[in-house]
UniProtKB/Swiss-Prot annotation:
It comes from Kineococcus radiotolerans (strain ATCC BAA-149 / DSM 14245 / SRS30216). One of its GO terms (molecular function) is DNA binding. It is found in: Cytoplasm. Gene3D superfamilies: 1.10.10.200, 3.30.70.980. This is Probable transcriptional regulatory protein Krad_3057. GO terms for cellular component: cytosol. InterPro entries: Integrase-like_N, TACO1_YebC-like_2nd/3rd_dom, TACO1_YebC_N, Transcrip_reg_TACO1-like, Transcrip_reg_TACO1-like_dom3, YebC-like.
Length: 253
């Protein structure tokens, strides 16, 4: 959900892209540290760490940075932070529900950053539980199509018996949805079938979506961008639905 550099002015676009790249690297490194701390530094016995490292590699995070993150997380090297996961709930423009996942070593700073981003961009924080019920914790695997002749049936055939609930064609990728507890089985089934995937992680999938026109989408994307720019924010999950026609109009604007 990060990106949307189209909202930046041309003058500042490169600086924005560079900053977002650095932010993306920092997020991925945090994920590796936490995975190593939780399940140990051996990827053969820690599928969460394996997936975090694979995602970092695909995003071109330097190997040295990855190795150091594993060592910090597993305790083999000093310097790891005491990361805590905090989830904030809120509403954006047009009543779009938001879950904001933070990974932070300072709860007060994270709360202030999220609250400021919300209030300055037409959003508001909500009481715990008032938004979360609109989302389900799911396993989400993204499979790139580039350089392959994979079909939706190929992917479905590989994962059907592993607990996959849905396989959808997203244009440049296929997306496999499962229960979060079946994520490892789906990932292993894809490996067994020789199908490479771009990412495999637990996510929050909305049960009901709010359709947005161009004006509403512009406001919601700006809020998501502002949240995304907060140092402690790892992920933003939202229940909006923007049609292909609206997205095309925004990209041409």
């Amino acid at each position: 959900m990060s990106g949307h550099s189209k909202w930046a002015t041309t003058k500042h676009k490169k600086a924005v892209v560079d900053a977002k790249r650095a932010k993306s690297f920092a997020r991925l490194i945090k994920n590796i540290e936490v995975a190593a701390r939780t399940g140990g530094g051996d990827v053969s016995g820690n599928p969460t760490l394996f997936d975090a490292i694979q995602k970092a590699k695909k995003t071109s995070v330097p190997a040295d940075n990855i190795d150091r993150a594993v060592k910090r997380g597993s305790g083999a090297e000093a310097g790891g932070a005491d990361w805590q996961t905090i989830m904030y709930e809120g509403y954006g423009p047009n009543g779009v529900a938001l879950l904001v996942e933070c990974l932070t070593d300072n709860k007060n700073r994270a709360a202030m950053e999220v609250r400021t981003a919300m209030t300055r961009n037409g959003g508001s924080l909500a009481d715990p539980g008032s938004v979360a019920y609109m989302f389900s914790r799911k396993g989400v695997v993204v499979i790139g199509k580039e350089g392959t002749d994979l079909t939706e049936d190929d992917v479905l055939g590989a994962v059907l018996d592993a607990g996959a609930e849905e396989v959808s064609d997203q244009g440049d990728t296929f997306e496999v949805i499962s229960e979060a507890t079946d994520l490892a089985a789906v990932r292993d089934a894809l490996k067994a079938a020789g199908i490479e995937y771009d990412s495999a992680e637990a996510s929050f999938v909305p049960s009901v979506e709010v359709p947005l026109d161009a004006e509403g989408a512009t406001k919601v994307f700006r809020l998501i961008d502002a949240l995304d720019d907060c140092d402690d924010v790892q992920n933003v999950f939202a229940n909006y639905d923007v049609s292909d026609d609206v997205m095309a109009a925004l990209e041409d604007a």
